[in-house]
Amino acid sequence: MSFVAPDDRAYYNYSRAPGSAHGVGHESTSPDQRLPSSHSYNKSASAPNESPNQVYHPEMAGPPGSSHSYPPQPMTPLTGSTAYPPQHPPSGSYYLPTQQQQQQQSEQHIPSPPSSSNRPPSATGYTPDGQPIIPVGVSGGKMFRCRGYGDCDKVFTRSEHLARHVRKHTGERPFPCHCGKAFSRLDNLRQHAATVHAEQAQLNETMLASLAPIHAALSQRASREQRRRGEVVEVPKGAVERRRETRKAQAAAAQAAAANGHSQQNSPYAQYHESQWNAPPHPRPRTNGGYDYPYVPEHSLNDDAGPSRRPSSSAGYGYQQGYYDSARPPTAPGTGSSGESMSGLPYPYRPMSASGRELPVPAHYSESEPPATAHGPPPQSPMYGNVPPAQQQPPNWSSPPPGHGAYPPHDAAAYPPPPEGYYHPAHAAHGSYPPREDVYEYHPPGWQGQYPPAATNGGPYAQGYGTGAPPTAPPPHESPFQYNVANPGAEGYPYQNYDSRKRRAEDDFGKDDRKHPRPSSPSNSQVPDSSTAAHANGAHDAPHPHPHPGAAPGNGAMDPPRPHDPNWLPATSERRGSLAISALLGSPPKTMRSRPSTADGGAAGAHGYESYHYDPHGQVSDDQQTGVDKEREKKEEVKQQDDKKTQ
């Protein structure tokens, strides 16, 4: 909306100005007037609702001496309503202009707008011969010019376009909705009803049908008022039609570029194409609901797109590559220009266009890039730094453990496969992890299928083995987390074929069958020598040799079950363990018997169960069988004594 100049009409709701209540109107003339020159068509910003073909926007200034070639146009005094068109408060009922309202409006005397001769002539478009340049399709017809609202001199090609434009100045909204919201244009109300009140279709149709005569009446009245006010201007048939232009600011941009050309040459910034920074042209509405956009030549986006733009981008910009190559110094040693500094980079570091074509790079991009020496392959990881070739680093089994940086990277070509017929040895080491090479199939040079490799100092193993202590350092190609055990051949080393399923192993490695043997006679509570117990059980151990030679007899419950004496009972300390093992392994259950407690049992009664020797293989010795018979006799005697007491 235009602002009103203080010298012009400041009361543009047709209210009286101070001291002009009875102002004299100008001489009325015919509405069909020729095109004036003193008050020509001003180039002002078009309203958002108007399309470019509706508004007359001349761009070229008139030739010297031709701005007053036509006599000034006298204005017709207005005798219409106070607010044109009439504005009524929106209400629920729809209205039509009544005769009473029209009579009241006609009684008010409204001064006419000031004469156009009082204003300075505005720039208009003329040919070199002095003919005005008009919009396309208006030659020999009429144009409708906005007058009386400050400096607004917009020209429209249709009467209804001028009528709805005037409502922007007056603030009139003659089309109310049933929700209470009013609009200045009927098409805006129709769109509002279709979107906001889409579910009230019947009510919308009734409302629009009632507003149709209002719209027709407003159009007729606007046409009459436009002729009365001299807003209808005939266009001579010889007028030159203005060429349809896609960019309205091209001429102004060319003049500005020519005026500032000398200063732009020394500017530190690139010269961009002015047409790329202008707002897009207003679309031309079509009858089918779409828009026609004028053709915009893409002359500046084909060969000079920027590094972050694509040739099809409307926001792309162009620049002069010569400026970037010469105006800035090289940013890294050995780089002459920004194009050379990044020309050897691979794709992720070099800007490319959508078609795969390399794009020039501005100098400010290369200011932040690393030196040219950094464009080689990526640096090696510090984990593998300073590593000599594997062939030049023999294994050292007595040196301190090297750091992680000494481990060479895995390279299949550097480590030949093992010889034919080689199989990894069984993991006989108890308490250690398997060698790292067995787990990862990693064979360093010098590996010949033995672990650890034979030393050259005459001993069967390297330094540190056989002394009962771990070696001083692990081999260099071995995992630093591996547990190194003592000499496997030394006495006390666990069994070669250790079975982890064994629940218990003996301490003396075959010298005794149990940890704490029992006395062989009921009267003797002393623990006999382990050799005696072993000799007593030798007959039973002989027929059942251990499956693994060299391994001590383990838990007998793991062996196949053998026939048991149903009356045999183990010692108290052995009952729970043996029963638990039997229950887990499915052995025949043993009948639990309570320990006899007699007053005259004495030491024999107290140690009656200690005379048995538990054979882990399920056999009962002769001494144990004798003790069982004696215990049975004692029980019978105790039972007889109890019977006598009860009798």
UniProtKB/Swiss-Prot annotation:
Induction profile: Expression is induced by nutrient starvation. Basal expression is positively regulates by HOB1.
UniProt function note: Transcription factor that promotes pheromone gene expression, which results in a subsequent increase in cell fusion. Also promotes production of melanin and capsule and thereby is required for full virulence.
Biological process terms in GO annotation: melanin biosynthetic process
SUPFAM superfamilies linked to this entry: beta-beta-alpha zinc fingers
GO terms assigned for molecular function: DNA-binding transcription factor activity, RNA polymerase II-specific; RNA polymerase II cis-regulatory region sequence-specific DNA binding; zinc ion binding
Superkingdom of the source species: Eukaryota
Annotated region (Disordered), positions in chain: 1-132, 220-647
Disruption-associated phenotype: Leads to growth defects at high temperature (37 to 39 degrees Celsius). Lacks the ability to engage in cell fusion with the MATa control strain and fails to induce pheromone gene (MFalpha1) expression upon mating. Significantly lowers the virulence. Reduces LAC1 induction mediated by nutrient starvation and leads to weakly reduced melanin production.
Pfam families per UniProt: zf-C2H2 (PF00096)
Keywords per UniProt: Cytoplasm, Melanin biosynthesis, Metal-binding, Nucleus, Repeat, Virulence, Zinc, Zinc-finger
Subcellular localization, as worded in the UniProt entry: Nucleus; Cytoplasm
Zinc finger (C2H2-type): 144-169, 175-197
Compositionally biased tracts (Polar residues): 27-54, 66-84, 261-278
Name of the protein described by the UniProt record: C2H2 finger domain transcription factor USV101
UniProt feature, compositional bias: Basic and acidic residues: 1-10, 222-248, 504-515, 628-647
GO cellular component: chromatin; cytoplasm; nucleus
Entry keyword Metal-binding: yes
Biased amino acid composition, Low complexity: 97-122, 249-259, 312-327, 404-414, 421-434, 521-540
Disulphide bridges, residue numbers: none
PROSITE patterns the record matches: ZINC_FINGER_C2H2_2
